[in-house]
C-alpha cells in the first residue's frame, strides 16, 4: 500500500537510509550499553555480598548476551541491505513494474523472480532473527529458574 503512494521510491530510499543510521548507532553502542549496565549494578543499593553475586552473574552471562545482541544487529543489517538492493533494483528498472491495487505488478518475469528471491531472503533472515530472540529468552528464563 505504501508503494502506491511512493511510486518514485523516494520515501522508501529515505526509510532505508534512516534504518541504516539507526542500526549503526545502536549496534555501535552495544559495548557501551553493557558497560553502563555493569556500572549501574556496581552502584546498586545492595549488600556487598549481594552485589558481588549479581556482578558475578552479570559477568558470567554478559559475554553471551553481547554476542547475541551483536548477532541480532547483524540480522537487522542484512535485512536492511537486502531491502536496499530491492529498492535499487526497482528504481533502476522502474519501467518494468507498476502498482495496481496496492500490489507490484511486474512486466518482466526475471525482475519478478529476482525481487521474489530477495523478499524470500528477507523473510528467512527475519525468521532466523526471531529464532535467535526466542532461544535467548528461553535461555534467560532457564537461568532465572536456576537462581530461584
Residue ranges and their predicted role:
Residues 3-106:
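Extended amphipathic alpha-helical interaction segments
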Residues 93-148:
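A cross-kingdom marker for long, charged
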